[in-house]
């Protein structure tokens, strides 16, 4: 299950089951949606851009192609804690003269994930600590996701999704690659391929959603990672969670209490 070809479909299926459980127990209508990396497919389903069947099929192919690219390129990723984006970019610029390394996720202030060739990630661990990072932790992942090493997978994926219907969203999807609100189905179809080799702008996504009037967030799926990130992005944000029966019941009770 550790390989991305297995984890991606499993995580999405779990997330969609949690979403359907919430919808069956609570009469809520979302005003917007977003998802972090793989989670964007849950967002596309929520916005009625993709059917459940197509979302799962597409995710399975995405996972397969990313797994192939990961096996071919042997990349890695690392989390950088408590170092400015400016200092990170400065360090990466030095290493980019030797090969492919870049930012994968702008998760929240003080937490950035980098991605690229394994030997460069290993060098970055030392270099970014020297530049003042509190910690730089190489992640237990099977590849350099959201990097140029995934470009081949993205090109094949773009061909694959051509055969699927991406409807116009009934609500905006705040998309990973530039944090903009998108409803056009054709635009979203193009963006899902680009997302495979581009950074996830989560900090900007949440900031934009709050600026556009979103007041309450519900994190659907495995765990409470995004709730923690959201709190660091904006301390006023309220994020509920649905990932098991207990969290479902707690979220329903809280939503009813707060109307």
Indicate where each model-derived feature is located.
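Cys-dependent protein tyrosine phosphatase-like superfamily
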Residues: 167-171, 175-176, 181, 189, ...
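Glycine-rich phosphate/pyrophosphate-binding beta-alpha loops
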Residues: 7-9, 144, 199
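Non-catalytic positions within long, well-ordered alpha-helices that form the structural scaffold/packing
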Residues: 23, 129, 210-213
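FabD-like malonyl-/acyl-CoA
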Residues: 1-88, 139, 216-246, 250
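Alpha/beta catalytic cores of group-transfer enzymes, especially the acyltransferase/condensing modules
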Residues: 47-197
């Amino acid at each position: 299950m550790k390989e991305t070809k297995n984890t991606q479909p499993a995580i999405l299926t779990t997330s969609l089951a949690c979403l359907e459980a919430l919808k069956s127990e609570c009469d809520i209508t979302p005003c917007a949606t977003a998802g972090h990396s793989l989670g964007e497919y849950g967002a596309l389903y929520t916005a009625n851009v993709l059917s459940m069947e197509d979302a799962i099929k597409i995710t399975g192919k995405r996972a397969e192609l990313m797994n192939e690219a990961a096996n071919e390129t042997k990349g890695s990723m690392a989390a950088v804690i408590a170092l400015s984006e400016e200092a990170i970019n400065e360090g990466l610029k030095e290493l980019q003269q030797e090969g492919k390394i870049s930012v994968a996720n702008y998760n929240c202030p003080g937490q950035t994930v980098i991605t690229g060739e394994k030997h460069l990630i290993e060098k970055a661990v030392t270099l970014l600590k020297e530049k003042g990072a509190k910690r730089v932790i190489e992640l237990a992942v099977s590849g350099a996701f959201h990097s140029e090493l995934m470009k081949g997978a993205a090109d094949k994926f773009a061909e694959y999704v051509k055969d699927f219907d991406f409807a116009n969203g009934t609500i905006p999807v705040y998309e990973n690659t530039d944090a903009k609100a998108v409803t056009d189905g054709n635009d979203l179809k193009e963006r899902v391929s680009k997302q495979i080799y581009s950074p996830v702008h989560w900090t900007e996504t949440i900031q934009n959603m709050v600026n556009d009037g979103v007041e309450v967030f519900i994190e659907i799926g495995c765990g409470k990672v995004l709730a923690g990130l959201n709190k660091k992005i904006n301390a006023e944000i309220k994020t509920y969670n649905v990932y098991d029966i207990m969290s479902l019941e707690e979220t329903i009770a809280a939503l009813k209490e707060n109307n």
